[in-house]
Amino acid sequence: MSLNHDDSQDAPQPKAKGKIATRRVARSLAMQALYQWHMAGQSLNEIEAQFRVDNDFSGVDGAYFHELLNGVARKKTEVDQAIAPNLDRPLDELDPVELAILRLSTYELMQRIDVPYRVVINEGIELAKVYGATDGHKFVNGVLDKLAPSLRSAEVRNHKR
């Protein structure tokens, strides 16, 4: 699925009710913005401003959207270094949508310990089901399942008890 900016307007956005839903929409929009950043090479400020104009942000956790978009970009090298050992191919050979989802989810695993790791993984899978290739969600699930124990070792250990 090609995901340029015009496609993002056609993609269904979940209706937001409460903190969980507004963050889900923020993740979806942040993933699309990260995809655009990767593909078009526009500045983050331009992309963020464009997304805020082109999308209804009334049901979006705007601060979370901003943090995810800018945080992934700021920590891109660190995020990519965490992802790379868990892949079966180089980062530059990944589907760009799946790469955007993995970067977003990895950033959350690394920086947002207030969000349970299972939530991060499930949200990444859901994004891949909506925007990724046919079996993209399985790939995203596999990579995030490998990543979680190294980034959230105590939480994963406690969950498995």
Curated annotation (Swiss-Prot):
One BP annotation, GO: transcription antitermination
Classification via CDD domains: Terminator_NusB
GO molecular function annotation: RNA binding
SUPFAM superfamilies: NusB-like
Disulfide bonds: none
GO CC, alphabetical: cytosol
Superkingdom assignment: Bacteria
Region of interest (Disordered), residue spans: 1-20
Pfam families: NusB
Record keywords, A-Z: RNA-binding, Transcription, Transcription antitermination, Transcription regulation
Keyword Transcription regulation tagged: yes
InterPro entries, sorted: NusB-like_sf, NusB_fam, NusB_RsmB_TIM44
Entry similarity comment: Belongs to the NusB family.
Function: Involved in transcription antitermination. Required for transcription of ribosomal RNA (rRNA) genes. Binds specifically to the boxA antiterminator sequence of the ribosomal RNA (rrn) operons.
Protein name per the record: Transcription antitermination protein NusB
Taxonomic placement: Bacteria, Pseudomonadati, Pseudomonadota, Gammaproteobacteria, Pseudomonadales
